[in-house]
């Protein structure tokens, strides 16, 4: 594009700044929604991954119908690829909560260590220091809480105490929401989760083993690479467990299960929430991009029509079609680039945090983790620029094919024609003059009509 046309382009931006801002604004909104909503899914999952890593969430959990002793833990802990393994005792019991009989799940926990697997974090109160004390999972505002100081009457042969006083509230990566595992006790639905000292259990066998896998923490836990590391180790654990079946053969019917995170409801549920946000991002911002294209098409068509004589003069002076079209394409390109860049910044700074905090009403993922989104921003800006450049080219293509002589003359008005409603006398004759003019304007100027319909639908 020649220097004179470049100057004329910037002069046109200054002269028609309102039009420039209209393209800039709709692109900004569209790109902000696309990058903000689309990146929210990634931010949510990476935040969960960081939370899981910081609190040592299990990679594998193991069950058997006879439980485990220390020798079993030692045996399975020697499996190639296992980093750490811990035994936990858990039971499901019925207690009275808020004047209702509800099922609670109780886990043993070593409160003397600050590096356990499935590490719990104190959010209120204190950890148990005396027999008959417990902490309860803090589920925020999702449901009516059990207050500190509440005495829970729990009678079970596996427990040394018959009641437990709630002295603290904790968060745990094992459960992210108030949806817990199912149980065969009571109604089959677990209402609350308690943690008590290991010494509070009467038995010396563990009901579940949790293990971490070497190198798994270095990978993104919702990615395929993570499971490529964990799955082979899970298979080796199952092979090693065959020797345990010989040990417990006399009991008859020995069963053993090794499960990864994909079998854990809370892990999968949070992933599905992120996937739903990703699905929304594929549809919702499309309306803004479509409106952006229509706004650009309408704006640039009007500009080209107004400058019909100027285009004819440029052609008469020897400027080729590409150079003349370049003026208007540059106009739309600059508006789209500016709106796209600012839209990316605003979208990434606002929407992910708002969406993350909104989901955190239900889920307890501690910290928001930021992840680079360069490729996504590039894609969002590229789509916006491409759509508007094509719309601009379409708006000036027909005029550029005309000769300078035709362009220097005023444009002939469109031939009058009836709209389809005029062929339906029963309807048309009931319209007053204003309604007839409105109907003709709507149905004859189809670009404006579809822009209005799309904007309202979006």
Can you annotate each of these PLM segments?
Residues 1-35, 329, 417-458:
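N-terminal Sec/SRP start-transfer signal
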Residues 2-293, 302, 321, 356, ...:
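Membrane transport/envelope proteins' first extracytoplasmic loop
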Residues 3, 400-419:
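Short cytosolic juxtamembrane segments of multi-pass membrane proteins
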Residues 8, 12-18, 294-334:
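Interfacial "coupling" helices/loops that link adjacent transmembrane helices in transporter permeases
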Residues 21, 25, 280-283, 287, ...:
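Alpha-helical transmembrane segments of multi-pass inner-membrane proteins
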Residues 41, 45, 49, 392-405:
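Juxtamembrane/interface segments at transmembrane-helix termini
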Residues 272-285, 309, 313, 325-334, ...:
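Internal alpha-helical transmembrane segments of multi-pass membrane proteins, especially GPCRs
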Residues 293, 297-302, 309, 333-365, ...:
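Small-residue-rich transmembrane alpha-helices
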């Amino acid at each position: 594009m020649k220097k004179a046309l470049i100057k004329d382009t910037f002069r046109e931006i200054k002269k028609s700044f309102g039009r420039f801002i209209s393209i800039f604004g709709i692109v900004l909104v569209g790109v902000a929604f696309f990058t903000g909503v689309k990146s929210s899914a990634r931010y949510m999952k990476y935040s969960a991954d960081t939370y899981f890593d910081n609190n040592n969430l299990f990679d594998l959990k193991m069950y058997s119908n006879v439980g485990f002793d220390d020798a079993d833990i030692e045996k399975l802990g020697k499996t190639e690829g296992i980093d750490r393994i811990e035994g936990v005792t858990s039971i499901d019991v019925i207690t009275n909560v808020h004047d209702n009989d509800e099922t609670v799940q109780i886990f043993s926990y070593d409160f003397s260590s600050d590096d356990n697997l499935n590490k719990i974090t104190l959010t209120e109160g204190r950890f148990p220091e005396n027999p008959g004390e417990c902490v309860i999972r803090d589920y925020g505002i999702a449901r009516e809480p059990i207050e500190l100081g509440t005495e829970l009457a729990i009678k079970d042969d596996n427990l040394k105490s018959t009641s437990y006083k709630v002295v603290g509230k904790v968060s745990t990566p094992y459960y992210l929401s108030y949806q817990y595992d199912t149980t065969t006790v009571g109604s089959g639905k677990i209402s609350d989760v308690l943690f008590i000292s290991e010494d509070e259990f009467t038995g010396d066998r563990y009901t579940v083993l949790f293990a971490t896998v070497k190198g798994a923490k270095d990978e993104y836990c919702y990615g395929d690479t993570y499971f490529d590391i964990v799955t082979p180790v899970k298979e080796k654990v199952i092979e090693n467990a065959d020797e345990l079946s010989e040990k417990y053969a006399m009991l008859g019917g020995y069963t053993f299960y090794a499960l990864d995170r994909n079998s854990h409801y809370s892990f999968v549920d949070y992933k599905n929430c992120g996937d739903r946000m990703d699905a929304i991002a594929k549809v919702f911002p499309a309306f803004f991009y479509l409106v952006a294209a229509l706004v650009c098409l309408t704006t640039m068509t009007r500009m080209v029509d107004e400058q019909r004589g100027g285009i004819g003069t440029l052609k008469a002076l020897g400027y080729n079609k590409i150079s003349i079209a370049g003026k208007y394409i540059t106009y739309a390109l600059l508006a789209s680039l500016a709106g796209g860049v600012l839209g990316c910044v605003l979208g990434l700074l606002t929407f992910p945090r708002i969406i993350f905090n909104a989901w955190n009403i239900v889920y307890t993922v501690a910290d928001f983790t930021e992840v680079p989104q360069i490729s996504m921003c590039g894609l969002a800006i590229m789509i916006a620029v491409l759509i508007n450049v094509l719309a601009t080219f379409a708006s000036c293509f027909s005029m550029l094919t005309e000769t300078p002589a035709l362009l220097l003359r005023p444009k002939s008005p469109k031939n009058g024609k009836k709209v389809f409603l005029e062929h339906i006398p029963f309807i048309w004759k009931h319209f007053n003059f204003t309604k007839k003019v409105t109907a003709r304007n709507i149905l004859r100027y189809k670009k404006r009509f579809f822009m209005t319909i799309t904007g309202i639908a979006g």
